[in-house]
Amino acid sequence: MSLVPQRSAPPPPSSSANRAASSLAFQPASTSNSASPTSSSTSTFANGSSSSTTAYRPQPTINTSVSALQGPRSGLPAQTGLAFSVSSLSNNPPAASPITAPSSALPWSSQNPAASGSTATFPPRPVRSNTAGPDTLHTISSVSASQTVAPVMVQRSHSSIAAHQASPSLNQSSPTLDADGPASLTTQSHFVHPSRDRERSRDGTTTPGSRNTFKSVFGGFVNSMSDVFSAQKKIEISTPYDPVHLTHVGFNSDTGEFTGLPKEWQQLLQESGISRQDQEANPQAVIDIVAFYQDATQSQGGSDVWKKMGAAKGNKAPATPRTDTSSEDGIYRVAPQPVLYEKPRTAPAPPGITHPNRPSEFGSPDLRQPPSNASTSSADTALRPSRSTPAPGAAPPPNAKTTSSSNPPPCKPSPASRAPDAPAAVSAASKNAKGPGSVPRRRETKKSTIKDSEVIAKLQAICTDADPTKLYRSLQKIGQGASGGVFTAYQVGTNVSVAIKQMNLEQQPKKDLIINEILVMKESRHRNIVNFIDSFLFKGDLWVVMEYMEGGSLTDVVTCNIMTEGQIAAVSREVLEGLRHLHQHGVIHRDIKSDNVLLSLQGDIKLTDFGFCAQIGESQAKRTTMVGTPYWMAPEVVTRKEYGPKVDIWSLGIMCIEMVEGEPPYLNENPLRALYLIATNGTPKINNPENLSNTFKDFLTTSLDVDAERRPDALGMLAHPFLKRSESLRTLTPLIKAAREQTRKS
């Protein structure tokens, strides 16, 4: 037996007929010196179902003898179970006297074992004729506190009950107050079957008179389910506590010096070509780009970014040759080992000064070099011809032979006999790097946290389980990287030419980028995106098969030819179409540049190299990670702000300058100073802008807007009037052939 406090609803009013029908009651065992509040007690039996209700109204202090509730009493027949009533209600009431009534008036006596301390006993089951009808409802009379009334008891239908089984539970309700008088006392002895527990309301009280119908059962189920789900509260995550700020870099405007700047950063600024005046003019930009540099050198993917920028050159003159040690290992880009297998690409320089070219990187894959010359190509030490910006509508030279005699050849790759010069240049750069003026050594790249077993499992899930050597024939190597080689091959049965990139997974530092690129390529089917064909995991090597773009990359075209505005517009339109498709599917490319735009001999233009692309969703509409090639980076990326797909629009604008001038802005600057100029100069300036049409200049200004909010998206840029001047893509064919011809001569 348990006492569970519950809140009971106010008793419903009862008619006088109901009160007359139930005139037999008994006095409870509890004694009190004052009026007691309303209370209810319920006893539930496991076997059987019956209920009886005894109601009390506000009344003076009731004092009854405890012996009246114990065993057979004088004046009452033994084991009759007849109730007794209180003869008067006063401060000193007389002892309870029995009420003469037929023995069939009540089926048993209501005793309070808890009050008497004895075990409750019950009479045999009453006959059916002496029980109340099935339609009899609980009735509780409503009277004032000053009236004298006997408790009212109404019987509900009874079923089988164990004669001497104790009640498994006793619920004591909480008191209620009557609006018109003192507290009322209502006690219920409610014997119910366990199934009637469904009739309880949500707050735990019993609703007398409610029927065990489908509605009540369903309501109880809904209430119980709502209680279950409401109990599952959302986990609260606390804010960080006890944070420790170890390094804080500030700027003292009085002294014009930075405070708290580590020595390595101070040396880096001194060697980067950022003057003291620059630091005083834009202290916040300096702090941003130094922090950017630090993040890049310590992050997992930072090594590729800075390798793309080339080795730092200290405080060298702007015309100092840029030694590129690019070794980006995208899926379809070969990471060159030293300088071999790199395409020559030089920056403009004054006449008479020779320097190594800016080598372009292998695309997706680098199919710019014919197979016969792939293993003999080397860095070019020849002079990069000075070029003037073409006037609008000027036709480009179809090949090297038609170039004006007043200008040097547009592109002169070095022959194979000049190959030893490249190692010499690399050796010289290595010696210079050991000097006191070199940039501090970069921290070693941390190993990827992803386990090899996880990579293998993911690759096996997305790769075809077959032997690629039986599906492709005549593999011919056209390039070699740190992690594998690039081959051309023919598909067995169809004789279709394909490009295959082989990668040794053990030598691949960023395996997660491999998986990312394969997934993006498989899901991005578009005429302006390089078509992914298949992938294989064969003998520990990953084979990625894609369509063969025999025209090479756009880098070959811009370094060896002068493009017209119509051709630039055509290339920009095709790139924007590919970007629109990616952005609509929640993908940011993040590395748009001429090296990642491949061409076919018919002039088809397709994007490649999705190793740095990012998937964005509703919960991550902006990103802050630093990836891409810094010379093509938007200011919001350099300054480590949140960015979105519009960073690709900025990179497209830089690529347009690349198509005009042959190289991106700040290419010959120290890498750190280049970042400083991107962050502070805003829209880069173009040489000889008077040679460009107003429409083209507006296109550049719009795409290179420093404010990312004002910068249009890919769809908005496609509506620009400049793209209406696009020429046919077939006009690019002569430029592609000219670049390939120069490559063969090398």
From Swiss-Prot:
Residues 106-121, 128-138, 156-176, 370-380 have a biased composition (Polar residues). One of its GO terms (molecular function) is ATP binding. GO terms for biological process: cellular response to starvation; intracellular signal transduction; regulation of MAPK cascade; response to pheromone. It is an enzyme of class 2 (transferase). Residues 472-723 form the Protein kinase domain. The keyword Transcription does not apply. Keywords: ATP-binding, Cytoplasm, Kinase, Nucleotide-binding, Nucleus, Pheromone response, Serine/threonine-protein kinase, Transferase. This is Serine/threonine-protein kinase SMU1. GO terms for cellular component: cytoplasm; nucleus. Residues 15-54, 85-105, 414-430 have a biased composition (Low complexity).
